[in-house]
């Protein structure tokens, strides 16, 4: 971040006279006082704790100046009405100043993987930066912008939403050149009236785009009412502008063809939904001048954010398909389809561990129960359920599967049977087996994966 104190003050409309402070060059912007280094701008946000309480600590660690909603004694400060708004204004200004091309990605599923893929492809030709981790909200996005390396040419930003209007704010800030909506599912349904309102929120990614900018959206009727008339809209899916024409799935890789590619692409990841993500990323990369051969080569060394669908090994030799970062009905259905399509190991069985999907609101139990349509005793030997809202699904499965092949462990305020879950999984898992783990991050299945990978845990 190459900005000066006086420049920042002008951008955010400082309410105090900053001319009395040296116009120092600022190195970075941080909202965690512990991460402040010499020459940084401190951004004291209000959350569970008020960042203003740590202004003194920030200066002890080397801060050059702080934003603040109140006067600060003995230190350079920029007085504003709202620190978060000022933080966002600063990021928007920095994007305009650097003239970097912005690519925005959202979706109920696939946004992080698509972001990773697109950034990876663009990096073959351009200096590229992307959202780190899950910094995809009203705080994380401006943080990403202000932390992009000097000389960045392409910036790939992930945009998340918890409430209607969240993505509108992010799009107006980022002003994307190209935007992608990967899929409209039921994620965060607790905060929306229905799936249509989720679609409305996702499609607001186009709100900050100029006319004739490129928007990629799924061939899903749910988005029809929200397609912008003044943008170049490209749809993807069966029978759409972009579609997969051939797909071969393997245990830890896949190969696919698309109607706009001359040759097939190989991916070192599993899941047909990842073929769709790769297709989208490839199309955008081609529009930016990346060659098909560069795309093909780049996918061979693709690395995705940890805990997005990945194969691991249990200490006993069994194969673990870990997908424990997050969960919603669409994502659970897709991973069950993928797991079912992969051939079983010789002499081994298939086991699924399914945990609660969070933030589904009043429809939670009903949406959990619908997963019964994705469970088949012809494919899965054993299904182990963990949670509270998933309890009825466990009962439905017990009526479909043979006795002794369905287990349920409770996780509620009054009782958590996690240790019993771990014990049962280890007893059920054979050396040649494959096991799928899927659930919301808060269900802590990542800890179960670690326990299977490390016998002493």
Protein language model annotation of sequence segments:
Residues 20-29, 85-88, 136-139, 159-164, ...:
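Short gly/ser/thr-rich secondary-structure transition/capping motifs
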Residues 14, 69-70, 100-103, 180-186, ...:
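Short beta-strands and strand-loop turn motifs
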Residues 6-12, 87-215, 219, 223-232, ...:
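Phosphate-binding loop of NTP-binding sites
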């Amino acid at each position: 971040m190459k900005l000066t104190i006086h420049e920042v003050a002008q951008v955010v409309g400082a309410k105090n006279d900053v001319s009395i402070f040296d116009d120092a060059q600022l190195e970075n912007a941080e909202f965690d006082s512990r991460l402040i280094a010499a020459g940084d701008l401190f951004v004291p946000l209000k959350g569970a704790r008020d960042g203003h309480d740590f202004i003194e600590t920030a200066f002890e660690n080397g801060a050059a100046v702080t934003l603040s909603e109140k006067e600060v004694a003995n230190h350079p400060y920029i007085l504003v009405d709202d620190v978060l708004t000022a933080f966002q204004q600063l990021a928007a200004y920095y994007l305009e100043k650097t003239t970097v091309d912005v690519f925005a990605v959202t979706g109920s599923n696939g946004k992080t993987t698509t972001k990773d893929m697109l950034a990876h492809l663009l990096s073959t030709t351009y200096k590229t930066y992307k959202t780190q981790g899950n910094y995809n909200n009203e705080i994380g996005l401006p943080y990403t912008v202000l932390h992009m390396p000097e000389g960045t040419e392409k910036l790939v930003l992930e945009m998340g939403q918890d409430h209607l209007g969240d993505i509108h704010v992010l799009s107006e800030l980022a002003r994307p050149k190209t935007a992608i909506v990967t899929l409209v599912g039921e994620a965060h349904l607790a905060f929306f009236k229905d799936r249509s309102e989720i679609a409305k929120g996702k499609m607001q990614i186009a709100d900050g785009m100029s006319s004739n900018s490129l928007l990629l959206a799924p061939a899903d009727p749910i988005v029809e009412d929200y397609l912008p008339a003044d943008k170049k809209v490209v749809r993807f899916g069966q029978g759409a502008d972009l579609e997969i024409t051939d797909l071969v799935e393997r245990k830890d890789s896949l190969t696919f063809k698309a109607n706009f590619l001359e040759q097939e692409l190989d991916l070192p990841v599993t899941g047909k939904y990842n073929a769709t993500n790769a297709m989208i990323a490839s199309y955008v990369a081609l529009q930016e001048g990346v060659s098909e051969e560069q795309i093909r080569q780049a996918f061979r060394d693709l690395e995705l954010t940890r805990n997005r669908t990945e194969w691991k090994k249990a200490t006993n030799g069994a194969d673990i398909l870990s997908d424990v970062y997050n969960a919603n009905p669409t994502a659970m259905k897709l991973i069950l389809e993928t797991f079912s399509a992969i051939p079983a190991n010789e002499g081994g069985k298939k086991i699924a561990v399914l945990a609660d999907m969070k933030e589904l609101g009043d429809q939670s139990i009903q949406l959990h129960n619908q997963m019964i349509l994705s469970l088949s005793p012809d494919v899965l030997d054993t299904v182990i359920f963990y949670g509270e809202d998933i309890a009825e699904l466990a009962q439905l499965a017990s009526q479909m599967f043979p006795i002794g092949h369905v287990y349920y462990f409770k996780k509620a305020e009054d009782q958590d049977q996690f240790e019993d879950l771990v014990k049962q999984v280890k007893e059920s898992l054979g050396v040649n087996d494959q096991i799928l783990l899927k659930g919301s991050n808060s269900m802590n299945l990542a800890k179960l994966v670690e326990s299977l990978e490390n016998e002493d845990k």
